[in-house]
């Protein structure tokens, strides 16, 4: 299911003295089946943008097309419930939204709310908890007895149980240790590959954006600043830094090595493995250049 923004603008508290423009002139598409990352400095419009992906917010100008559904400025949209089943959103710290007595009831809440029978919802809960790498035995336990990482996986299972076509992730690894972050990101990538899920990731982690995303959208002051593959986007390193966007650690090391040893590494290096390989290649070719004094 493709999602397209056409000249989208969003203003909070529209037509009041407190009106504030959060998005403007946003033109971007997320074709079905892809893995995308949205990056940008705090306040660049990322969170406002993703709330348009399933109608939580509606544009004050322009149109958002979600599959065959058009959400346009000035039109009161009704029956958005089916849309929110197709586009599942995992907000920051989703475990804070857990509330039921058992893990099973929490995961079943979404499917039941969409009219699924109790028996079918329980089956979806069993499938979803295995998708997020947890044992079915946890279904009978209180979610509040689990570890923080387990609680987050339960909350994600609740979204997956609704079988969305698009999975939107807003800083999904925030607050987790490095091991937990890596496990969760690998889980999302596996779901993307095995289930054909379209994934839209909002992140401040440039390593994750570079590693997983096929296309990266850079937001700045409410509009799209850059869009392209990781190689294309991070080739604009100086411009990104000027607008407050961090760079992958490998690019920072690349610069430091070039300056320290007076060598030129022409290829973009988006992981430490790539950087190591490129440094070895340059040195084998006698890539040392005399440092200017």
Curated annotation (Swiss-Prot):
Transmembrane segments: none
Pfam families: ABC_tran
Subcellular location: Cell membrane
Topology within the bilayer: Peripheral membrane protein
Keywords: ATP-binding, Cell membrane, Membrane, Nucleotide-binding, Translocase, Transport
A single cellular component GO annotation: ATP-binding cassette (ABC) transporter complex
SUPFAM superfamilies the record matches: P-loop containing nucleoside triphosphate hydrolases
EC number: 7.-.-.-
Function comment: ATP-binding (A) component of a common energy-coupling factor (ECF) ABC-transporter complex. Unlike classic ABC transporters this ECF transporter provides the energy necessary to transport a number of different substrates.
Assigned protein family: Belongs to the ABC transporter superfamily. Energy-coupling factor EcfA family.
Alphabetized NCBIfam families for the sequence: ECF_ATPase_2, PRK13634.1
Assembly with partners or alone: Forms a stable energy-coupling factor (ECF) transporter complex composed of 2 membrane-embedded substrate-binding proteins (S component), 2 ATP-binding proteins (A component) and 2 transmembrane proteins (T component).
Descriptive protein name: Energy-coupling factor transporter ATP-binding protein EcfA2
């Amino acid at each position: 299911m493709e999602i397209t923004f056409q000249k989208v603008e969003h203003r909070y508290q529209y037509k009041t003295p407190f009106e504030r423009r959060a998005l403007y002139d946003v033109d971007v598409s997320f074709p079905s089946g892809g893995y995308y990352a949205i990056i940008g400095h705090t306040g660049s419009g990322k969170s406002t943008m993703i709330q348009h992906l399933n109608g939580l917010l509606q544009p004050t100008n322009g149109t958002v097309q979600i599959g065959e559904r058009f959400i346009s400025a000035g039109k009161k949209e009704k029956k958005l419930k089916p849309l929110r089943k197709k586009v599942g959103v995992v907000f920051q710290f989703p475990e804070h939204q857990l509330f039921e007595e058992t893990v099973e009831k929490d995961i079943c809440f979404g499917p039941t709310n969409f009219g699924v029978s109790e028996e079918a919802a329980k089956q979806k809960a069993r499938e979803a908890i295995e998708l997020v790498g947890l044992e079915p035995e946890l279904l009978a336990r209180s979610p509040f007895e689990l570890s923080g990482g387990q609680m987050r996986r339960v909350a994600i299972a609740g979204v997956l149980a609704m079988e969305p076509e698009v999975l939107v992730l807003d800083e999904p690894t925030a607050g987790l240790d490095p091991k937990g972050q890596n496990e969760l990101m690998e889980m999302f990538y596996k779901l993307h590959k095995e289930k054909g899920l379209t994934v839209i990731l909002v992140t401040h982690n440039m390593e994750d954006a570079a590693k997983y995303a096929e296309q990266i959208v850079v937001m700045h002051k409410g509009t799209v600043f850059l869009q392209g593959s990781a190689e294309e986007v991070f080739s604009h390193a100086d411009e990104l830094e000027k607008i407050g966007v961090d760079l992958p650690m490998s690019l920072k090391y690349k610069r430091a090595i070039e300056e320290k040893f007076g060598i030129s590494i022409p290829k973009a290096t988006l992981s430490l493995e790539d950087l190591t390989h490129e440094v070895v290649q340059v040195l084998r070719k006698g890539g040392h250049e005399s440092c200017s004094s």
